[in-house]
Amino acid sequence: MAVLFQDRAFADDGLWLFNNPPAKQLKDKYHFTPTSAWLEHIQKSSVRVGRGGSGSFVSPDGLVLTNHHIGSDSLQKLSDPTHNYLADGFYAHTLSEEKQCPDLELNVLQSIQDVTERVNAAVPPSMNAGQAFLARNRVIADIERESQNTTGLHSEVVKLYGGGTYQLYRYKRYTDVRLVFAPEKRIAFFGGDPDNFEYPRFDLDICLFRAYENGQPAHVENYLKVNPQGPSEHDLVFVSGHPGHTNRQLTVSALTDLRDRVLPFQLQTLYRREVLLAAFGAHSLENQRRIDSDLFGIRNSRKRSDGQLATLLSSDFFAARVEDENAFRSELENQPALRPVLDSYNRIDQAENEMMKVLVSGFLLEGDWRRGGLGFDSRLFRIARTLVRAAVERPKPNGERLAEYRDSNRAPLELQLFSPAPIYDDVEELELSDSLTDLAARLGPEDSLVKQILAGKSPGERAHELVSGTKLKDVTVRHQLYEGGAAALEGYSDPMIALATLVDPAARRLRRVFEESSETEQGAYGQIARARFALKGNEIYPDATGTLRLSFGEVAGYEEDGKAVPAFTTFAGLYQRANDHQNREPFDLPPRWIDRHDKLNLGTRFNFVTTADVVGGNSGSPVVNEAGELVGLIFDGNIQSLAGDFAYSGEQSRSVAVDAAAIIEALDKMYDAKPLVDELVAGKPLSR
C-alpha cells in the first residue's frame, strides 16, 4: 500500500516535477508522451495563488481561474457591512468595476535550475548540525539573491527528496490582482461541512481574478483554452498545481511521532478554534461575515487532519509502512556501498526526539512564522512580531537572516505587512483571549514567561489591553516602524510591540531547536534519497513542497460499500439534493438558482472525479486534457483521498473537480456573464 517513494509503473500516483515528468508511466499505460513544448505551456499557464492555492491563466488578458474557497480571503477583505461578496458573490461587468485585492499575489513558474552541487559544496560532512544549518542558509540566500538580481524574477531554492536535491525556481510575480467574478457561497460550498471531502458533490467552487501590469490587464502568452464540453469518462487528464505538503517519505518513527504527538495537538487546537469562531459567528450576520473565511479554513483543516490521523491509526496502513521500510533496509544491508546509509535512520530518530521535547512550547510560542505562534492568535501580534524581528534581521548579512527576511522574500513579506485589509477589534480580542488561555493552560499558570505575558491580568483583560492599546492597525505606523528599524522601536510605547519583544528570545531558542534538528533530518533523508536513486533510478517523485507539480489519471468512478459511485454529477442532481434536504442550510440554494433553474440544461455535468493524485494545495488546479485544454477545476478530494498525505491508493481515492461544462453553463445562464464566457471559450479580446 505505501512506499517511501512511489515508483509503481501502472499506478496513477505521483506529484511529478515538470523537469522530471512521468514519461514512461504515461507512455506505458496511456500511450501519451508529453512534449517539452506541451510541458512548458502547462507550466507557464499555471499560477500559484497567494500562499497556499493554485490556479491558471484562462485568457490572454490575464484572467485567472481558481476556487471560491481559495479566493475567500480576498472576498472577505473586500467586503464591508453593506457588501458581503463572500456570501452574495460578485461580478464586474466592466474592467473599471474589477476590485483590487489588498494583499493577493500570483506567482508563475518560469524556469527550474538544479543547484544541488553548489548547496552541498557549502556544507562539508565535518560540520555539526548548527554549523551546517547556517552554511546551508548562507549559500541558499546567495543563490536566491544572485538569481533575483540577474533575472528580476522572484527566486526560491527548493529542497526536494528531503534534501537529496536542491533546485532554483524562478517566478514572475503579479501583485496587482483584481476580483472579476465569484458566485454565492451557498452554491460554491453547497452542502457545507457535511459534504466537505465527500462525493458525490454539487459545488460551483470557482472564482475569477485578473492579473494587472502597469495598471492594465496583463497580456500573457501562455493560457489554457477552456473546452466547454468538459471531459468524458475514462479520458486521460492532468492536474497542474501546487500541492502543499506530504509525508510519503517519512520513516516509521517519524510517522509515529506525527500520529501520537503532532496531529493530536493540532486537532485539539483546531477543534477549540472552530467552536470559538462558530459561536461568535452565530451572534449576528455581521459577526458571521467577519469570521466566515477563517472558520471555513479551520473546519477544512480539522477534517483533513482527522482523516490523516485515522490513516495513521489504521493497523493495516502502519504494518505496510513497517514492511516497506524493513524491505528497504534489507536492500541497504545487502549493498556494502550503501550499508552506511542505515545510520540515517538513527539520526532521524535522534532529531525527532529533540523536536518532540519542545513540541508544545514550540508550537505555542513560535509555530509557523506566518501564524506567529498558536499562543498568540492575532493578526496584530503577527504584525508586531514582523516589525520586531525585521529590526533585528534586516541589518544582518543576507545569508545570516531568518529565511523570511532574506532579500528574496522581502517583497512577499512587505505585501502582507502593509496590507490595508480591515482588522476587527472584536475578532482580535476573541482570538487572542482564547489563545492566551490555551497558552496558560498548556504551559502552566506558574510558568514565568506566562506570568509576564499575562501581566497579572486574565487572558480576556490582557487581550483587551493589547488590542485597544496598539497603534498597529494604522498602516502608516507600520511603515514608520519598519523603515526606522531598531532606532524607531527603541522607546516606542506600544503594548503589542512590547509583547512581541518579550516573547522573542524564547521563541527564537525554540525555533533554533527545530531548525537544527531539521538540518540533521535533512542530511539523513538526503542520504536515504540518494540510496534510493542508486537502487531505483530517477523515475521517482519527491514529497510535495508547495511548488508546481504534475499529476495524471483518468476520469473514473469507484465502488463504495458495494455500490457504484458514478464519475459525474449533474445540475439535476443538485436540485434533487436540495429538495431532499428541503432546501435547508447547508443544502439551501441561492435565490437566483431557484428563480432561474428553468434556464439551465439540467443534464449538464456539474462535478466529476479523477484518479489523479492531489493533496491540500491543489485546490484551484486546472484539469487539462491531452490537447492542453482546461476541462475542469480541482476543488476537493473524497474522504478516501485524505490518506494521500502518506500514500496513494487508486482503488477509491479520487480528486473532485468542477466540470468546465458547468462553469460555462452557469456563467451564461445564471449570471448573464456572456462576455466572460466569450473570453474563456474563445479567448476574445476584452471589450467590456
Per-region residue spans from a language model:
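Terminal presequence/propeptide segments associated with secretion/organelle targeting
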Residues: V3-R688
